[in-house]
């Protein structure tokens, strides 16, 4: 599982030029799954994200988590996080989980974040979306469950 986490002042998702979800501060998460991801992977990543200390304290050090600070989450499915561009000029997405599995895990991920007490807005799984993000910092962090659990 990969999550591109962006700390933001605001973020929104539009489908066919209509805003369907938006937040006014917190985290924008672009979320992708691979074949070997499981509900346990989802649980691990959700807990990791809500506990990450990526907001500044009064000393301007990243020392406060979203759980401590408060804020919303915009979660957007993003199978292209598993693009393989090692050969040729066209990306391959064979490392991405099949849509049915990915959608199940994506729904579970959003449920875990909601159960942790956050307002979670989402995109539309599998849809062509326009995502607008006003980064705060900017702070952008790539989380990869394979790298984190070694």
UniProtKB/Swiss-Prot annotation:
<dbReference type="GO" id="GO:0019478">
    <property type="term" value="P:D-amino acid catabolic process"/>
</dbReference>
<dbReference type="InterPro" id="IPR003732">
    <property type="entry name" value="Daa-tRNA_deacyls_DTD"/>
</dbReference>
<dbReference type="GO" id="GO:0043908">
    <property type="term" value="F:Ser(Gly)-tRNA(Ala) hydrolase activity"/>
</dbReference>
<keyword id="KW-0963">Cytoplasm</keyword>
<dbReference type="GO" id="GO:0106026">
    <property type="term" value="F:Gly-tRNA(Ala) deacylase activity"/>
</dbReference>
<comment type="similarity">
    <text>Belongs to the DTD family.</text>
</comment>
<keyword id="KW-0820">tRNA-binding</keyword>
<comment type="subunit">
    <text>Homodimer.</text>
</comment>
<dbReference type="GO" id="GO:0051500">
    <property type="term" value="F:D-tyrosyl-tRNA(Tyr) deacylase activity"/>
</dbReference>
<dbReference type="GO" id="GO:0005737">
    <property type="term" value="C:cytoplasm"/>
</dbReference>
<keyword id="KW-0694">RNA-binding</keyword>
<protein>
    <recommendedName>
        <fullName>D-aminoacyl-tRNA deacylase</fullName>
        <ecNumber>3.1.1.96</ecNumber>
    </recommendedName>
</protein>
<keyword id="KW-0378">Hydrolase</keyword>
<dbReference type="Pfam" id="PF02580">
    <property type="entry name" value="Tyr_Deacylase"/>
</dbReference>
<comment type="function">
    <text>An aminoacyl-tRNA editing enzyme that deacylates mischarged D-aminoacyl-tRNAs. Also deacylates mischarged glycyl-tRNA(Ala), protecting cells against glycine mischarging by AlaRS. Acts via tRNA-based rather than protein-based catalysis; rejects L-amino acids rather than detecting D-amino acids in the active site. By recycling D-aminoacyl-tRNA to D-amino acids and free tRNA molecules, this enzyme counteracts the toxicity associated with the formation of D-aminoacyl-tRNA entities in vivo and helps enforce protein L-homochirality.</text>
</comment>
<dbReference type="InterPro" id="IPR023509">
    <property type="entry name" value="DTD-like_sf"/>
</dbReference>
<feature type="short sequence motif" description="Gly-cisPro motif, important for rejection of L-amino acids">
    <location>
        <begin position="137"/>
        <end position="138"/>
    </location>
</feature>
<dbReference type="GO" id="GO:0000049">
    <property type="term" value="F:tRNA binding"/>
</dbReference>
């Amino acid at each position: 599982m990969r999550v591109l986490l962006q700390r933001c002042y605001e973020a929104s998702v539009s489908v066919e030029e209509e805003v369907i979800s938006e937040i006014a501060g917190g985290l924008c998460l672009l979320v992708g799954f691979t074949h070997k991801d499981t509900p346990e992977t989802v649980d691990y990543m959700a807990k990791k994200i809500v506990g990450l200390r990526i907001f500044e304290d009064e000393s301007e050090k990243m020392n406060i988590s979203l759980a401590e600070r408060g804020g919303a989450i915009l979660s957007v499915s993003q199978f292209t996080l598993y693009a393989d561009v090692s050969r040729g000029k066209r990306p391959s997405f064979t490392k991405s989980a099949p849509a049915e599995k990915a959608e199940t895990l994506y729904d579970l991920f959003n449920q875990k974040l909601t159960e942790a007490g956050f307002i979670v807005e989402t995109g539309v799984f599998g849809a062509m979306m326009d995502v607008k993000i006003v980064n705060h910092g900017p702070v952008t962090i790539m989380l990869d469950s394979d790298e984190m659990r070694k």
